[in-house]
């Protein structure tokens, strides 16, 4: 089988946003050797919608740590909601971006990595509300997906069920933090490549070691 790299992430995860240039580069350089799959982790799934103000005080400090470690910069439109939570109408939930990813994979499963990164950019740089259908419209044009069909599927219980299946799978795998990368090399063998933010060179070394070990086991 072709080794498959599983990228477990959440659209609202700031560390995943910081990691997005790394995973984009891995995808670009290894897409001819590996299959890639993105799984949404369901990081924010409140029983009742909670305003951004619940987490804003924590994020006001934490985003600087992410910037310092990763070199990523958060956009002013996103930061406005973080520093003006009492004026924001945001109620974050991981559900809709996860459903959107499941719908997208019906069209372009091989491009799930760049799409996931684009969704994170839409939130953390452009300040788009991922619980709003309109947050995805510009990406439909980019990837050549018909609006009407996409939005019908976005509100279909079938794709909602697919998203929750991903949440359950991530939990079943014992993954509690994001980003996490796994490399599956056979039906019974997988390697944990990284847990949390990892720079490109460190990740590349771990990936090459895993591929080498898998090759030795197969021979």
Question: Where do the model's predicted regions map?
Answer:
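Extreme N-terminal starter segment of soluble prokaryotic enzymes
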Residues: 1-6
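C-terminal cap of thioredoxin/glutaredoxin-like
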Residues: 7-8, 12, 19-28, 118-219
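Structural alpha/beta surface segment adjacent to cysteine/selenocysteine redox centers
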Residues: 20-123
């Amino acid at each position: 089988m072709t080794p498959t790299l599983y990228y477990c992430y959440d659209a609202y995860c700031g560390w995943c946003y910081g990691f997005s240039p790394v995973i984009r580069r891995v995808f670009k350089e290894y897409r001819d050797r590996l299959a890639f799959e993105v799984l949404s982790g369901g990081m924010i799934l409140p029983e009742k919608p909670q305003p951004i103000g619940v987490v804003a005080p924590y994020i006001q400090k934490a985003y600087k740590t992410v910037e310092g470690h990763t070199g990523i910069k958060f956009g002013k439109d996103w930061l406005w909601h973080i520093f003006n939570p009492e004026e924001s109408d945001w109620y974050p939930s991981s559900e809709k971006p996860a459903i959107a990813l499941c719908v997208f994979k019906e069209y372009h499963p091989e491009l799930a990595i760049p799409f996931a990164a684009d969704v994170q950019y839409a939130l953390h740089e452009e300040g788009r509300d991922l619980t709003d259908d309109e947050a995805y419209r510009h990406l439909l044009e980019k990837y050549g997906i018909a609006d009407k069909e996409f939005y019908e599927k976005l509100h279909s219980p079938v794709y909602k069920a697919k998203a929750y299946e991903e949440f359950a799978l991530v939990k079943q795998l014992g993954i509690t933090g994001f980003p996490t990368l796994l490399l599956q090399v056979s039906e019974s063998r997988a390697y944990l490549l990284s847990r949390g933010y990892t720079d490109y060179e460190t990740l590349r070394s771990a990936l090459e070691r895993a591929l080498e070990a898998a090759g030795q086991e197969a021979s």
